[in-house]
């Protein structure tokens, strides 16, 4: 009897793909895990966090800031509830929705400061795939946190809403708004 490894015992990893070629190596969905907790030391070596499952990276990002810092069990529970809501609303695999949300939320272009002898100007630069994924996960969790603050809706509902809107590329999503603002400023600094 062989049983397939599924996230939270429900969501299958088979069929989850990343259509964006540049992000395929950095959005890790190949490691099949039951729960998004590996206790791995992904920050010890440069670029090793690319091997960390994307759901675990979302959980780690969810438990940042203030009163929720370090509460990984709570972060994992929020993600599990959000995935249930996503499945009920979209009838799609929540892992695929997450991959699409991360893919759509990462800015492709940014601006950096270039300065010499006191004069500073901004220059538009392309964003590396690793930074795109990092920034996308950060924007998704920041938008979720902002939506849930002083709101009757639960964090899981806000996370599900943010992921669904970001996967569709909807301007209602906080992460898509921030990405567009970043790319707009980068375009003005070309």
UniProtKB/Swiss-Prot annotation:
The modification N-acetylthreonine is found at residue 2. GO terms for cellular component: cytosolic small ribosomal subunit; extracellular matrix; nucleolus; phagocytic vesicle; ribosome; small-subunit processome. SUPFAM superfamilies: Ribosomal protein S7 (SSF47973). Its main location: cytoplasm. It is found in: Cytoplasm; Nucleus, Nucleolus. GO terms for biological process: ribosomal small subunit assembly; ribosomal small subunit biogenesis; translation. It comes from the Eukaryota. GO terms for molecular function: mRNA binding; RNA binding; rRNA binding; structural constituent of ribosome. Component of the small ribosomal subunit. The ribosome is a large ribonucleoprotein complex responsible for the synthesis of proteins in the cell. Part of the small subunit (SSU) processome, first precursor of the small eukaryotic ribosomal subunit. During the assembly of the SSU processome in the nucleolus, many ribosome biogenesis factors, an RNA chaperone and ribosomal proteins associate with the nascent pre-rRNA and work in concert to generate RNA folding, modifications, rearrangements and cleavage as well as targeted degradation of pre-ribosomal RNA by the RNA exosome. Component of the small ribosomal subunit. Part of the small subunit (SSU) processome, composed of more than 70 proteins and the RNA chaperone small nucleolar RNA (snoRNA) U3. This is Small ribosomal subunit protein uS7. It comes from Dictyostelium discoideum (Social amoeba). The gene is rps5.
């Amino acid at each position: 009897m062989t049983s397939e490894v599924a996230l939270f015992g429900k969501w299958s990893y088979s069929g989850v793909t990343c259509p964006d070629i540049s992000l395929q190596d950095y959005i890790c969905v190949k490691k099949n895990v039951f729960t998004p907790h590996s206790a791995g030391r992904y920050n010890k070596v440069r670029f090793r966090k690319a091997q960390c499952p994307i759901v675990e990276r979302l959980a780690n990002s969810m438990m940042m800031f203030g009163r929720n810092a370090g509460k990984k069990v709570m972060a994992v529970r929020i993600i599990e509830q959000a995935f249930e809501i996503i499945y009920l609303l979209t009838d799609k695999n929540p892992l695929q929705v997450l991959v699409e949300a991360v893919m759509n939320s990462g800015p492709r272009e940014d601006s950096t400061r270039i300065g010499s002898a006191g004069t500073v100007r901004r220059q538009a630069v392309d964003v590396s795939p690793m930074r795109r994924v990092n920034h996308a996960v950060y924007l998704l969790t920041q938008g979720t946190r902002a939506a849930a603050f002083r709101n009757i809706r639960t964090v899981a509902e806000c996370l599900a809403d943010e992921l669904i809107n970001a996967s569709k590329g909807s301007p209602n999503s906080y992460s898509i708004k921030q990405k567009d603002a970043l790319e707009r400023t980068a375009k003005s600094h070309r």
